[in-house]
Amino acid sequence: MTTHNICALITEFPLVKRLIDLEEVVWFNPNITTLEEGLPYVGLGAANIKDASERLKRFAPYLMKAFPETAASNGIIESNVVEIDKMKSCLEAQYGTQILGRLMLKKDSHLPISGSIKARGGIYEVLTHAERLAIEAGLLNESDDYSKLFSEEFRQFFQQYSIAVSSTGNLGMSIGIMSAKLGFSVSVHMSSDAREWKKNKLRSHGVNVVEYEQDYGVAVEQGRKEAEKDPTCFFIDDENSQTLFLGYSVAGERLKQQFDDMGIIVDAEHPLFVYLPCGVGGGPGGVAFGLKMAFGDHVHCIFAEPTHSPCMLLGVHTGLHDDIAVQDLGIDNITAADGLAVGRASGFVGRAMERLLDGYYTITDERMYHHLGELSEQEDIRLEPSALAGMMGAVHVSQDQAYQARMQFSEDKMNNAIHLVWATGGGMVPEAEMSAYLAKSGR
């Protein structure tokens, strides 16, 4: 992008200058609409989520055998919701802001198998592909007990096929571990910001790790090219995959059930705010879609990105979506939040969900580390840096009177609110790595 074009973009969208200056920015989109009006742009609906949910139930007996850690939840990969009241008090004191309502944490950081939100979409897409291959070969029917897949016969069948994915880390972990367990030959193309321990964990599962000196965009491009050379290879495309998106979307109905069990009401008088860290957008986009389908217009989803990688905010705010990358503006896309180090957002997710997402904000690495240390100290919960991106959300909503007024959030409604921070990863971080994170946080 030329200097002239950047100047023109800034003239039309002054917020872009603040992104270029790496400022922490908050933007509540004035153009959001109702679920009824916004849903046609997604191109998916309740039937698609039901299909995904049913598929995951079919695979539950297999997952219980293949991953005994899922036995306690009967083969369903799901995470707890916990209240973080001490952290709430800490944020209120730190930012001089009263957060009305309750502050809670969704611990996708501690999902079984791969310890991140990517255990939802990544594992689901691998299972969908495996099911399709086995059914087409006449080895499986949807009415079968899927635990039969945990056998040498099926491992040998899947060994004929390969799977490839490009990742900054967590998606690669989920897809790599799941694919290898089924018997697939699997390659994970890792960008320069991927953590060494994630690569080592994948290798320990027999995964071929392909390393790049460049960022996520290059890893995707090269991964796709390599996969095209092999007719038996299935490339999982984090930027455009509707299957991944639907794997994440099942989280909505699951959370609704959890809230029902906890006696938590979400309606016009009891709003739900959900703060989701965003990289390329597939994970938070799919979860937000599922939440909208479960709670309708009473849930308000807000995406959080690093100041050095604000790709979704940039794409949606300018309307350029995947036609612009942060690097076009001289933003380096280098962040400690490795799962969020993406320069170009998913055009599919941006265009599908822009009318249904209340807002976006950016956060510095320093602040993520700071909150990492605070959460560990206050609540004894340890996360990786990117999982803390959502922690500022309740502060921003509480401070933005214009947003509250436009959305008609009265003080009574805000007192009834639930603020849910979606913790996206960190449950499997090695002790030495976590100690380094805590040292950087000053704790």
UniProtKB/Swiss-Prot annotation:
Catalytic activity: D-serine = pyruvate + NH4(+)
Pfam family, one: PALP
Keywords noted in UniProt: Lyase, Pyridoxal phosphate
Any one GO molecular-function label of the UniProt entry: D-serine ammonia-lyase activity
GO BP annotation list: D-serine catabolic process; isoleucine biosynthetic process
Residue positions, PTM N6-(pyridoxal phosphate)lysine: 118
Signal peptide from the UniProt entry: none
Cofactor: pyridoxal 5'-phosphate
EC number(s) reported in the record: 4.3.1.18
Family, similarity comment: Belongs to the serine/threonine dehydratase family. DsdA subfamily.
HAMAP family noted in UniProt: D_Ser_dehydrat
Protein name: Probable D-serine dehydratase
Organism: Vibrio campbellii (strain ATCC BAA-1116)
Organismal lineage: Bacteria, Pseudomonadati, Pseudomonadota, Gammaproteobacteria, Vibrionales
